[in-house]
């Protein structure tokens, strides 16, 4: 599987995850996939949409679009780039992975997953309210426990034969113990066993080294363009 296809899948996964979170605010059109989320209008990853890999950006700003538009393009009419938050898109062909030993992975509730993410990223009721309301058969939660409680979590969205890995988070006191690597290795092994051929995600600065050690490679960079004030 080449980089262009992995990039297409990663970008689609990000947009479809945001649209799924957005509920009634979902935006799905040929040049933008995401959601308008009013209470998170200052969050560039929740009140957001992505331009599909094979589409040009919208020709002009549109009040029906969220405040942040992500794209691989170098410019978007009517918007200004925020270069500090450019986001690497990563992908991995699962058929290249060797068998791995299993670890015990449980399924946290959506509420638990959202709350752990908010704590991990220093937010209060940003992601959690949206995640609690999710109702989609393509979504699966995953988690590892430590001291009897969930310490590391992730959410996957199945799109065709790709799993889009989203909202990986580890509680502060359990970081730097390899939990995220162990969890994602198990998640990908399970996905491969159910017919998935790729895993894709978007990386934060903290997560990027973890994902690269797991074999993910950078296949694109999404740039953030904000509505001009």
Question: Model regions: which residues?
Answer:
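N-terminal charged segments
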Residues: 1-64, 75-76
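Conserved active-site alpha-helix within GNAT-family acetyltransferase domains
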Residues: 74-82, 181, 193, 205-222, ...
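Conserved GNAT acetyl-CoA-binding A-motif
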Residues: 63-71, 191-203
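A conserved beta-strand-loop-helix scaffold within acyl/acetyltransferase catalytic domains
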Residues: 125-171
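Conserved acetyl-CoA binding element of GNAT-fold acetyltransferases
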Residues: 43-53, 161-172
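Conserved acetyl-CoA-binding loop-helix of GNAT-fold acetyltransferases
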Residues: 55-60, 170, 176-193, 213
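A short beta-loop-alpha structural element at the N-terminal edge
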Residues: 1-9, 101-113
């Amino acid at each position: 599987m080449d980089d262009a296809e992995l990039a297409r899948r990663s970008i689609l996964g990000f947009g479809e995850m945001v649209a799924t979170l957005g509920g009634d605010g979902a935006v799905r059109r040929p040049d933008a996939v995401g959601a308008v989320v009013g209470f998170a209008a200052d969050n560039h990853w929740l009140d957001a949409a992505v331009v599909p890999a094979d589409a040009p950006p919208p020709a002009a700003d549109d009040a029906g679009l969220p405040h942040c538009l992500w794209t691989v393009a170098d410019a978007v009419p009517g918007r200004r780039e925020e270069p500090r938050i450019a986001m690497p898109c990563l992908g991995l062909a699962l058929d290249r992975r060797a068998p791995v030993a299993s670890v015990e992975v449980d399924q946290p509730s959506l509420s638990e997953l959202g709350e752990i993410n908010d704590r991990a990223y220093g937010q209060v009721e940003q992601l959690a309210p949206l995640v609690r309301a999710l109702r989609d058969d393509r979504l699966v939660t995953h988690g590892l426990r430590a001291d009897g409680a969930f310490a590391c979590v992730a959410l996957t969205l199945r799109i065709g034969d790709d799993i889009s890995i989203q909202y990986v988070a580890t509680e502060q006191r359990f970081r730097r113990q390899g939990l995220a690597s162990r969890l994602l290795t198990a998640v990908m092994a399970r996905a491969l066993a159910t017919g998935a051929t790729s895993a894709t995600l978007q990386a934060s600065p903290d997560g990027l080294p973890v994902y690269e050690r797991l074999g993910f490679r950078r296949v694109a960079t999404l740039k953030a363009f904000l509505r001009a004030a």
